[in-house]
Each structure stands twice: as C-alpha cells, then as structure tokens.
Design a protein with these regions (language model features):
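Nucleic-acid nuclease catalytic cores
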Residues: 64-156, 751, 757-758
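Conserved pre-motif I regulatory segment
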Residues: 176-219
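Walker A/P-loop
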Residues: 211-233
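Metal-dependent nuclease catalytic cores that hydrolyze phosphodiester bonds in DNA/RNA
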Residues: 1-85
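Signature of the SF2 helicase/ATPase Hel1-core->accessory helical subdomain module
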Residues: 230, 257, 261, 337-354, ...
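A contiguous, basic/glycine-rich beta-loop/short-helix subdomain that forms a polymer-engagement track
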Residues: 330-350, 355, 366-373, 473-587, ...
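Conserved RecA-like P-loop NTPase helicase motor core
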Residues: 584-595, 645-758
C-alpha cells in the first residue's frame, strides 16, 4: 500500500485509486497469471503516485476520522469538462481477455472513479459527475466501457463509508510513520558493553555502505554476531530516513528465525516495529500434499473462496494484536478467517519494516516479489544476505532449466480432442529428434548403452518458438478445466525456459545429453553474477555475509559484487581454544582411497583418544564414508558410531542430532558427508560436539556440467579449476570445521586430513584465523598433540 504519513502535517495521504482498491476489493483467489485469468497486468493511464506526491489542493480532500487526519487526492488529468458538466475518466489497459472482467474488478474501478468524483464535486461545487471507466486489451481493438452519472449525495455516502473502513488502517499508518521512526532513530545496541571485537567493525562498515548506497561483502567467522551486526545498523537507518524497509534474505529456516530472535532482543526499544518471516507457498498451503499440484482455486481450496472479501479483517487482526509475524501466528489468523496463509503473509509484509524470506523472493525469475521489485522500483530497500556463500550455486540453478524427451512422450496422446496440444507435442518431439542427432555426433558406449552429448553457446532466434506453442497449448488444456499434474509441471518448466531464454547470453550454454533413447536438453547458466548484480540494484544497499567467504575476492566476483567494499574479520574466539591440526601426508584422492582407508580409521582413533566425547568425521563421498566406517568398526568394536544415511527424513535427521548429547558418557563418532545436511547449519553447542575431522579438500564430484563451467571460467577468469572446484571445495571444508566451537567458552579439535592442505595453492586460501594450524604426519604425533591440548 502506497499510503504515507507526513509528520509535518500530521496527516495520512492516500490516492483515490489506492483507497478504492484497498477497501472495495472482493472475490476469490483464482490466480493463474498468464493462463488467462483476471490477475494479469493492469496499467492505469495516469502516472502512479510515488512516495512524496505533489498534491494540488483543488484535487484533494481532507477529513478527520477517529482522530486521524486523512487526505485523499486524485489526478487532474482524470477530470474532463464536457458540454454539460464534468466527467471523471479512468482508462485501464490489460493483457487478458475483457470477457473475464468480473463484477469485482468493475466495482473497484467504479469506486475509484466515485472516490475521485467526490473530491472534484467538493472542490468545484458540483451536484453530480459522470464516472467513465474504460478497459482496453493491450495490442488489440477490444474495449469495454462503463458510464454512470452519480449525484453528489451518493458520492458523499460512498466516500464516507470508504473512509470509515480505512480509518483503523490509517491510524496504523500514522503510528508507523511516527512511533516506529522515532523508536528506530533512537535505537541503541542491545547488549551491555556494546558490540564485541569484530562486530563493531561490521556495524560501522554497514552504516557506511548504507549511507553511501554501496554494497559490502563480509567474512565474519562464527561468534561475531552476524545477525545483530547487520540488522542493527539496517533498522536504525530506517529511523534516520535512509531506507523504507529491510529485507533479510536467507536460504534456511533456522537463520530466518535467528533474525526474528534478534528483533525480540531489541523489542523493548522498538515495541511498534513489525517483522515477518515469509514461508514458502508449499509450507503454508493447507491443501497441498507433496507430489500433488497446488490448486489455488475455490474448486480445490476453500481458503481461496471470497479471499478478498475477508482479507482486510484478517489483516487488521494481525496488525492490531501482533508485531512479530511467524508462520505459526499467520497460520492461526488465516485459519480463523478462512483465508490463504501464504497470500496473507505477502499482504502483511507490506506493513512490516523487516521482511525475512528466501533468496528466491528477490532472484528467481518466476517467484520474485513483484509487489516490491517490479511495482515499487523507486522504494529505498536495504538487502541483507545471510549465508551468502550458498548464493552462487542457488542462483546458477535458478537461471538454468532442464527438459527431457520422455516428459513430452508421456503426454503427447493425452488430449486428442485438442489439436493444438497434440501438434505442439509433436513439434517438440521433432526438436528432440534433432537434438539426438547432434548429441550422437560425439557418441560413446558406457555400460553397453550408447551415449552422446552436444554443447553450443549460441541460441538461435527461433529456438523458443515450439516451446511457446506448447505453453499456449497447455493453456487450452487448463481453460477446458482439465486438471493434469503432469501437464502443469511441464507448463511451469516451459515458463521457466521462456524466462531464461529472455536473459540468455554469453554467460549461458546449451547442453544436450543423449543416453539410450532418452534425450535431455539443459540451458545452463554458467555465471549468474550479472543477474545477482541486476537484482541487487533494486535496493539501495546490499550487505552479503557469511562465516566462510574464502577467498573473499572470488566470492565478491561470483556474487556480482566485484567493485564492492569487503571486510574480513578475525575469529572472536581465542585461538588457544581450538586444536587445529593437518595430517599432511595422506592422499584422499579417488584413486588412493582404498589404500588410505585403514590409515584414516587409525587417525580417527588417535583424534578421539585424547578425550571422551562426541566427534564427527566428514567424508568426500558416501561410499568412502562406508568403507572407512566398516574398517573402524572392525578395528575398534567397542567405540559407538552413528552414520548419516543416503536419504533421511526430518525425523531421522533430528534423531541423528539428538544422539550427540553432552550429558552422555563415553565417546560417540558420527560419520557424515561433507556438504550434506550435517556439515552446515547445525548448532551443537557445549559438549555436544568437541571435535571434527575433515577428510579431503571437499572438491565437488567431477562432471561434464562442472567441466563446462570450468571452461567458461578458464576463458573469462583464467582460473577455471579454482573457481569451479578448489574454492567451492574449500568452502565446504570451512563450513564443516565451523561445527566445532560455537561460543567463546568452548574448546575443541579440528583435524584436516589431506596432503593438498600443505600445498602452496591451499596455504594461500586458508583463512587468517587458521594461521595457528599445526602440520603433522602420523597418528602418534596426533595423539600426543590432542592429549596435551585437553590437559591444558
């Protein structure tokens, strides 16, 4: 909502269009966007009101409702002098069929004209006015017009009713503009003694980045207090008038909740600040079951029925009674009023100073929040990116898309009654036949199966045409109310393909793979940094931070922040609390794993012999994990072990973590995969984990696709192997090592096992806070070192 409060005039300002749309909306959720539903694009002929409108008094009307001063204004270009009297004209251009304009849309359009008409009548002393509303379809001559002469009395009655309904929201806007701003401007750092070492530098540099409207990339080791160090200056900047809203982006629910917890710590200073965590649509939907298609229509979900009739009541309940909006609170209110929890959270976010959500709500081509990053291009947003080491890989996948021949073979005969659908399927299958021939120009035989591949960085102008035909054919299926999960999944993938093709350039490539009769087409984004850069430009400042951004220059580059300021902080924990050792004479390369497995088992035994407690050993692959664990169990049968399995339910993951109990006597050795669920994002504090051993340098598994990425970076950065394998691998090592020592009073052992860690290449990228690492070559010296450490 674009209504604002001006402290100087002690008044809430809102346009006639905004007021009418907010108060008069009604009907169901039935959003199928480009499939032909009413929720397509709408462009009003006059300019949209921006943050500080230049309001002519002759076209504005001020009233006081329940103690709140409200000014509603309209645009001069809407008023026209006729031969007899005046008309108020609103022209809408839409991108969908005018046949599906319903009473709800017409009601909002007419109420907009009514609201503006009343203002004109008041200022010009008119007894009536003609309200004209016209709809035109973009790119065609199709038009629908609605005309109505309305008396002053009717205009006044409608206007006063809208003001009465808007009044409680106006009070909230006033409180937000006065109380919240004042609270944030005087916000103090919430902990006694002020920021800790390193945290202060983080805060100062964040303030500077916001003031100068630049980006900052921060490597802040565990214990710095990254969440508070980023949130505190960002929120205070709202109070200082430097920003409107803060977005805290993260890829994990645990870090999202940490942001809300930080607000709770400051809550006594900012009681009126509103913060929200937007969960994914799948997690919010009460009708969705994994494996099914989500159907956001009254026929399938009762919470979409009359959603827009009920939304304001639900919204007001939340705004008046809560300030921190978790998924649980939003779900409770959504259930009370029988409305969609996800849509309610999006609506509610517009009233919040802090929005916590996933990366894809900014970066994903089909999931980004259009209400902020398309409709409000001039708003002053601050972006905070937690765990930003995950962003390059997430983004690369967001801008890549895969199609398979078998998907279209499975649906080609489904709807013989829809000729366009059958023809479109056949057209795409013909394309896949061509892809097959291209792939087989580089054919080989693997396990008695004929395989081939083809790579081309160019994309012809007509490449997308058969897929666009298929998109239109899918729409015909949906228009006939034929519900088909399989077709819907293909349709969504084709929409993604269309979006990716629109940004396809030299940073993409087309990869075709044929295995037997199956053909896979993959449009690969090799370097998403340009898209990350473009999306971050939608905010005034971006702060990207993580405990593991090594090397910092590499991450600044792949995050689209090549020219940004950087900050690398030291660990706040005493180095003497960490026994950091590298066994530098063991090779864990794939070809050497059979020879090194027994040695690894003996090294584990030496590491844990110094002190009883809980340990985790991280391996580069599951097969290597199982190989070493079996040897370890055979050699040391009395030592309890637990292992990560290939696929674990949430319940199984919790049980695995619960086994690391600090009150349990004896020793437990956990066997996990590096880069998996238990090497990042878990917080085993105190005695729950006193040691971690990292086997190998974390290199991603070599693949054709990664080698394509490597070749790209060889050409563009002259360092393809490091960009594709070395640096991402080292990041996994640092993340796994970071599971040990989570607070300043903890002590623990971190052991790296691989001869490559002692090479100049790796010594150059080992972070400064690991400068105290000892290099050993045998289990006996390891045992002596850890024993002495624990005796200190």
């Amino acid at each position: 909502m674009s209504a604002i409060y001006d402290k100087g005039t002690d008044c809430v300002y809102i346009s006639a269009k905004e007021l009418a749309e907010f108060i008069s909306r009604g009907g169901d959720i039935g959003a199928k966007d480009s499939r032909g539903n009413k929720n397509g694009k709408t462009i009003v002929s006059h300019k949209l009101w921006q943050k500080k409108p230049n309001i002519l008094d002759s076209y504005a009307f001020t009233t006081i409702s329940e103690g709140t001063k409200i000014t509603v204004f309209s645009y001069p270009e809407c008023l026209h002098k006729m031969e007899k009297g005046y008309s108020i004209d609103y022209i809408y251009t839409v991108d969908y069929s005018l046949d599906i304009i319903d009473n709800g849309q017409l009601e909002v359009a007419l109420k907009t004209a009514v609201c503006a008409g009343y203002i004109m009548c008041e200022r010009l002393g008119l007894t009536e006015i003609e309200a004209n509303v016209s709809f035109y379809r973009e790119g065609s001559d199709e038009a629908r017009e609605f005309k109505q002469v309305i008396s002053y009395e009717d205009l006044k009655g409608n206007f006063e009713l809208m003001i009465a309904l808007f009044s409680p929201f106006a009070k909230i806007i006033k409180d937000k503009g006065s109380n919240v701003t004042e609270q944030l401007s005087s916000l103090r750092f919430p902990f006694e003694g002020g920021p800790r070492e390193g945290q202060r530098d983080f805060i100062i540099d964040t303030f500077r980045a916001i003031k100068s409207r630049k980006r900052l990339v921060v490597q802040a080791p565990t214990g710095i207090g990254k969440t508070m160090a980023s949130l505190y200056p960002a929120l205070k900047s709202i109070g200082c008038g430097d920003a409107d809203k803060v977005f805290y982006f993260t890829g994990k629910t645990t870090t999202a909740l940490s942001a809300l917890n930080a607000i709770d710590i400051m809550r006594n200073q900012i009681p009126d600040l509103r913060s929200i965590h937007i969960s994914s649509k799948d997690k919010c939907c009460v009708s969705f079951k994994p494996g099914d298609r989500r159907r956001c229509e009254p026929k399938y979900c009762h919470r979409t029925k009359s959603y827009f009739d009920k939304i304001n009541v639900a919204l007001l309940d939340l705004l008046e009674n809560y300030r921190t909006y978790t998924k649980e609170i939003i779900d409770e209110i959504a259930q009370r009023y029988e409305v969609c929890s996800y849509e309610l959270s999006l609506e509610l976010s517009e009233w919040c100073e802090l929005v916590v959500c996933d990366y894809n709500y900014l970066f994903d081509l089909n999931a980004y929040l259009r209400r902020y990053f398309e409709i409000m291009p001039e708003a002053d947003f601050i972006f905070l990116f937690d765990e930003s080491h995950n962003l390059p890989d997430r983004a690369r996948e967001m801008y890549s898309v895969t199609l398979q021949k078998s998907d279209f073979e499975g649906i080609k005969n489904k709807y013989p009654q829809i000729d366009e659908f059958t023809v479109a399927c056949q057209g795409i299958l013909s394309e896949f036949d061509t892809y097959y021939q291209l792939a087989m120009s580089e054919k080989m035989e693997i396990n008695d199966t004929l395989c081939g591949f083809y790579i081309n960085s160019q994309l012809s102008d007509d490449f997308i045409l058969p897929y666009l035909d298929m998109i239109e054919a899918c729409k015909k299926v949906f228009r006939k109310s034929l519900d088909d999960d399989e077709v819907n999944e293909i349709y969504l993938n084709l929409k993604k393909l269309r979006s990716v093709c629109e940004i396809y350039d030299k940073r993409f490539t087309t990869y075709i793979e044929a295995v037997g009769d199956e053909v896979k087409l993959r449009i690969m984004c090799l370097d998403p940094s340009f898209m990350l850069d473009a999306c971050m430009k939608k905010g005034i400042c971006s702060i990207l931070f993580s405990a593991t951004l090594t090397p910092l220059e590499y991450f600044s580059d792949v995050l689209g922040c090549e020219k940004s300021n950087t900050l690398s902080l030291k660990s706040p924990f005493p180095p003497e609390n960490q026994c950091l050792i590298c066994i530098s004479n063991v090779s864990t390369r794939f070809d050497d794993r059979d020879k090194s497995a027994t040695n690894i088992a003996n090294i584990i035994r030496a590491m844990i012999a110094g002190k009883s407690g809980n340990y985790i050993v991280y391996f580069p692959s599951y097969s290597y994990l199982m190989q070493v664990m079996e040897i370890f169990k055979e050699k040391y049968p009395k030592i309890p072990v637990t292992a990560q399995s290939r696929s674990m339910s949430e319940k199984a993951k919790k049980e695995f973590l619960d086994s690391f109990d600090e009150k349990k006597e004896g020793t437990l050795v956990g066997f996990c995969v590096m880069g998996g669920s238990f090497s990042e994002g878990i917080d085993l504090r105190g005695e729950r984990l006193i040691g971690a051993m990292i086997v190998g340098v974390g290199l991603p598994t070599i693949s054709t696709e990664l080698n394509i990425v490597k070749e790209y970076f060889d050409k563009t950065r002259e360092n393809g192997y490091a960009y594709t394998y070395t640096y991402p691998g080292m990041n996994k090592v640092l993340q796994a090592a970071g599971r040990v020592i989570r607070s300043e009073n903890e002590r623990g052992v971190v052991l790296l096992v691989d001869d490559r860690f002692a090479s100049p290449e790796y010594k150059m990228i080992i972070p400064e806070y690991w400068s105290h690492m000892k290099y050993l070559t045998n289990a006996r010296d390891l045992l002596d070192t850890v024993t002495k450490f624990w005796k200190k």
